[in-house]
Design a protein with these regions (language model features):
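Short glycine-/acidic-enriched loop or helix-start segments at secondary-structure transitions
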Residues: 18, 139, 159
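Ligand-binding pocket scaffold of soluble enzyme catalytic domains
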Residues: 144-145
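Conserved hydrophobic/aromatic positions in well-ordered beta-strands
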Residues: 7, 81-83, 102, 148
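Conserved metal-binding segment of the jelly-roll/cupin
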Residues: 1-12, 114, 120-141, 150-152
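A short beta-strand-loop-beta hairpin characteristic of the jelly-roll/cupin
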Residues: 1, 95, 99-123, 161
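A short beta-loop-beta micro-motif enriched in histidine and acidic residues
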Residues: 72-79, 86-100, 116
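A short, N-terminal "cap"/entry segment at the start of jelly-roll beta-barrel domains
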Residues: 16-81, 163-167
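Non-heme Fe(II)/2-oxoglutarate
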Residues: 83, 153-158, 162-166
């Protein structure tokens, strides 16, 4: 069997900033969810079957619960997605108002460019792309790149200020 990685991301900084505490389990708008690896792989393969256009930012699966499905968030304030990039391809430079915190799952020969600076990837590293930074991801390797990204996108979604644009 393979090992496991526990990567924990919460909205605790937001709660602390506002002086709040997490709601009791019975009152929370968050559901426990489980996404089996086989289903994630199946969905990712389906995405790759769809032709990529110039207005496509990349290949991604967005994770959500039944109660958060309408906003496409995993929590009211957080968005979680598995992004992917085919071997030998580069993602078109873009920006958005939310921060992007990424866990590199598979990324040999991959890197990101953030505000003109190259950041090489390493396995299981966490990278941070600041809000509004122009960035792109590049796969110079021979395998599909996989990176799990959490963003404070829920806040921007509810305020209608996502600010996504190609650079």
């Amino acid at each position: 069997t393979e090992g496991a990685v526990l990567w924990v991301v919460t909205n605790e900084p937001l709660l602390a900033f506002e002086g709040f505490r997490a709601a009791a389990v019975e009152r929370t708008p968050i559901d426990a969810v489980h996404f089996p690896a086989a289903e994630i792989a199946r969905q990712l393969d389906r995405i790759y079957e769809v032709a990529k256009g110039d207005d496509t930012a990349g290949f991604a699966i967005i994770f959500s619960s039944a109660r958060q499905e309408g906003s496409r968030n995993i929590m009211p304030s957080l968005t979680l997605g598995l992004n992917s990039l085919p071997p030998g391809e580069s993602q078109r430079p873009h920006r958005h108002n939310s921060v992007a915190v990424a866990l590199v799952i598979q990324g040999e020969g991959c890197w990101s460019t953030v505000d003109g600076r190259r950041k090489d990837w390493s396995p299981w590293a966490t990278t941070v792309t600041p809000p509004t930074a122009v960035h792109s991801h590049h796969n110079g390797g021979t395998k599909r790149a996989l990176f799990l990204i959490v963003q404070d996108g829920g806040l921007y979604y509810h305020a209608r200020t996502m600010g996504f644009s190609f650079a």
